[in-house]
Amino acid sequence: LMMTIALPGCATLKNGGMTQVGDTQQWDSNAWLRIDSDNSIHFVLDRVEMGQGTYTGMTTLLAEELEVDPAKVDVSFAGVDSVYRNTIYGLQITGGSTSVASSWQIIREAGAATRIMLIKAAANTWGIKESDCFAENGAVINNAADDKNKGKKITFGQLAAIAATYSVPSDIPLKDKADFKVIGKYNKRLDALKKSTGTADYGIDTDLPGMKYAVFTRAPRWDSQIRDFDASKIENMPGIEHVFAVNKPSAVGIAIVAKSYWQARKAQQALTVEWAESELTQVNDASIFAQYKKDLADDSGKNVRSEGDIESALENAAQTITAEFEMPFLAHATLEPQNCSAWAKED
């Protein structure tokens, strides 16, 4: 018996220090969090939002420990860096419902460490103990009983320059779940408004210098192969630069490369492809369910556990209900066009 268990990952939190951008000072407290002198909070999300809610969920983890309103956090997506690797898979990837599981501790520690440093900065500013301060709504509050500044607050943005001079604490205690304010509570989707108003940026909105666009015509059925295709009808259409076949185990189809997406899409609509079918291309819902019923009727399988007397229970039941449910194949796919961007360089 082999059992695989995913353990919480650990990451080294490094203080990135202060930088000046125009009139604003920016503190990169770690790879996931930046606080500006105007008290704006910026979260670098290292997982892809595909409708599953990481944009809101991951921001909530950070906001909980930092003590800020998730709705007031500006979210941007991370670039490529080993620090953003998925600790379950060992590489920078989003999938397998692992985003929160792999980042539960890391992102919370990023927020908690920053909060600790900000509280230290405020305590030193007021000349009081750190235990006499607490963070709330993007500010540190003075709670020292006998201090003249009791009840006053200093925003995170005002404290950033001081906190930027500190080392990241080695001990980063996290909140007890009984003290959670936003984790596990009702939170509105932070990306809902942008998606509803058409202002959200999707992967397909990527625009790089000299970028080309390609569409890929896939086989209509599993295991189909290209028998023939006529590129002559489309290769001279406006903007078309390349038309070629792809024959790989992971992908079979025709790629059309153009200067714009719409040019590639129009050419795709005019493309004629003849597909060679195989035994697998004849598989359909009817044949799949027929095989299921055949397999279910075969009782030669090994019984690994048996409890109770099912036959007797059914015979003596006052009422029995028999029903058969069938569900068609459901593709695990996004609603928007599947897409990706690649920047190929000579080096």
Q: How would you label these PLM feature ranges?
A:
Residues 1-347:
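Structural alpha/beta core scaffold segments of enzyme domains
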